[in-house]
Regions:
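GST-like domain detector, emphasizing the conserved glutathione-binding G-site
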Residues: 1-136, 237-240
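C-terminal helix/juxtamembrane-tail motif
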Residues: 2, 216-243
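Short, contiguous strand/loop micro-motifs
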Residues: 4-6, 193-194, 218
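Conserved alpha-helical elements of sugar-nucleotide-dependent glycosyltransferases
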Residues: 13-17, 202, 215
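Short amphipathic alpha-helices and their capping/turn residues within compact interaction modules
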Residues: 26-27, 83, 87, 150, ...
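Positions that flank functional sites
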Residues: 36-37, 171, 225
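GST-like fold's C-terminal all-alpha helical module
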Residues: 94, 101-212
Length: 243
């Protein structure tokens, strides 16, 4: 069975945590919109599905995954569905729920990242809200990044007698998502994250260990990994990254 992932073909965005899980597990999947050469046609392919009233469990927005006749939307729910199939979560119910809790926190964090460059409205261009973005980013860097990273670091400390991972004794999809967070912060806020990393050694250890996994390393060095750019969740703007 080949999974079909629907997400915007030009960004990592919220769909990247799903791609990382599929790549790590070496699953057969089709990144559907990326197989369409024309960007406008790729967007149309997704929007036509979203506008289709055909009785399926209709997603509100991408990412969504199709597995046979099953349609699942929202990155955290997609991962909750996939993880047992891909051996990316424990078979213990309490650990599965905790992993899902962590992933929902990741979702919250990604929204806060997005709001640094779109603090007023998604319908406005970044250039239309630069001054508000500067204000939002100052608070995000000084308060929100440390708060989230401390949370992840604390989870890792609490689990240190069992493993170096976030949940239980094995790598889970939450660790892959934490990797994506650090990669994104290094791209979008390199000066800020450089000052913070030494305070969260276990978080950085997770990032480093995942980077060295052959399947992940191969993915990162392939054309399947979309580069960070100015259209995704993590965006680099010099005026938001002042020393």
């Amino acid at each position: 069975m080949t999974y079909k992932l629907y997400y915007w073909p030009h960004i990592q965005g919220r769909g990247e945590v799903v791609r990382l899980a599929l790549e790590y597990s070496k699953s057969k999947y089709e990144d559907v919109a990326r197989n369409v050469s024309d960007p406008d046609s790729a967007r149309t392919l997704i929007t036509e599905f979203l506008n289709n009233n055909n009785g399926v469990n209709l997603p509100f927005a991408p990412p969504f995954l199709i597995d046979g006749s099953t349609v699942i939307a929202q990155a955290a729910l997609i991962l909750y569905y996939l993880a047992p199939k891909l051996n990316l979560v424990s078979d213990k119910q309490d650990e599965r729920l905790f992993a899902h809790q962590i992933q929902l926190t990741v979702t919250d964090f990604l929204m806060e990242v997005h709001d640094t460059h779109h603090p007023i409205s998604n319908s406005l261009y970044y250039e239309d809200q630069i001054e508000e973005s500067k204000k939002r980013t100052i608070n995000f860097i000084e308060n929100r990044i440390p708060k989230y990273l401390k949370y992840f670091e604390t989870i890792l400390i609490n689990n240190k007698k069992i493993s170096d991972w976030l949940v239980g004794s094995q790598l889970s999809y939450t660790d892959l998502s934490l990797f994506q967070i650090i990669e994104g912060l290094r791209y979008a806020f390199p000066y800020a994250i450089t000052k913070l990393e030494s305070k969260f050694p276990r978080v950085i250890n997770v990032r480093n260990k995942i980077r060295d996994i052959p399947a992940i390393n191969a993915y990162l060095n392939s054309n399947r990994r979309i580069p960070f750019n100015t259209m995704g969740v993590f965006r680099y703007y010099p005026e938001l990254n002042k020393k």
